[in-house]
Amino acid sequence: TMYVRGLATMGAGTPLVLIDGFERPLSSLSQDEIESVTVLKDAASQALYGVRGANGVILVTTKRGILEGMKVHASYQFGINTPFRLPDMADGYTYALAMNEALRMDGLSVLYSNSDLEAFRTGSNPELFPNVNWKDEVLKNKGTTHQFNASFTGGGKNVSYFAAINYIGDNGFMNENYFSPDYSSQMSWDKLSARANLDINATKLTLVKLNLLGELSQHNRPATEYSTLFPMIYDVPAAAFPVKTSTGVWGGDNVRKNPVAESVAKGFSVGNDRALYADLRIIQDLSVLTSGLSAELAIAYDNRASYWDNKTKNYLYESLQPVKDNGGTITDITRTRYGQETDLSFSSSLGYQNRVTTFEAKVNYEKNWQDMHQLNAAVIYYQEE
């Protein structure tokens, strides 16, 4: 969340962001497309933008062409992302000791015998007395980011242009040790955008500006929602059950779900976002009527849509209970199975679809007196639907 006025912001509202004069998300821009950023607040923003500018205004101007030969700029960036401030997880032995202590303080019988505690401590029977760090099993320590930018600037006597291509690819933090060979449930995000800004001097007094921006992005994630999966990593004790049992079936029980199985064995979801931003602005110099007078007409069309493709399945899992003789020696294992292994099933859903058409008409007047005084006045008509 971004604030212009800090704690003075009304109703915790965010500022109005205008890109080349139209309200659009900052996330649609790469840094190579930005020419300048201007921040307005208080009376300055209120005067021009009314209620929309009550929490401040951020004006972003994208780059334009130049009246000379083409210039090409390209760059590539690679980054390694590392999560931080992740808690240390209690191991199975520590959990078992704490559980026994809690029960003892409540006047109840302990859950784990001394031989059970020793098995947790030594790891002699990891199937019945597991020590699973669910954070490490589900997540890995590093993710990667790739970013490529290319821009082309140029023009001639009456036409100039700026064009840019931007690609961003993020590969996430899911541990791939248990991934299915049939699909990937890795967290990933890929975005491709292309921009074209065109300036045309139609006459000596008429300037036409055309801006086009298209975006395609794709987001891949496990079928289990993040809001469900990540709390599960912290809720399931290290001593609850193994990731997989000796029979090759996912570990689990009828109370808690297996975080690893939930992250890799339930399928995956792919989110697709599409966006088109287009605007046309005509600027007419009216200095033939009076010096400093000009008029503008502008129209913009924005079309954004998001939809999800889901391929989901169920999985088989089993809980284990040791069978002990009178002396406390384990003689057998009781296996109770839940769920069933199914094939992937397909479904889709529409996230959102927005279409916005904006029209703006403006008359500007500028006057300077001996470089000591300056007058700027504007009459603006704005319509959005």
In which residue ranges do the predicted regions lie?
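Membrane-proximal, glycine/serine-rich, low-complexity loop/turn segments characteristic
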Residues: 1-3, 7-16, 22-27, 44-276, ...
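Detector for glycine-centered tight turns/loop "hinges" at secondary-structure junctions
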Residues: 21, 246-248, 327-328, 371
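Entry/capping segment at the start of metal-dependent catalytic domains
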Residues: 31
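Residues that line or immediately flank small-molecule/substrate-binding pockets and catalytic motifs
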Residues: 41
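Small-side-chain secondary-structure face that scaffolds active or pore-lining regions
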Residues: 166-191, 221-228, 275, 288-385
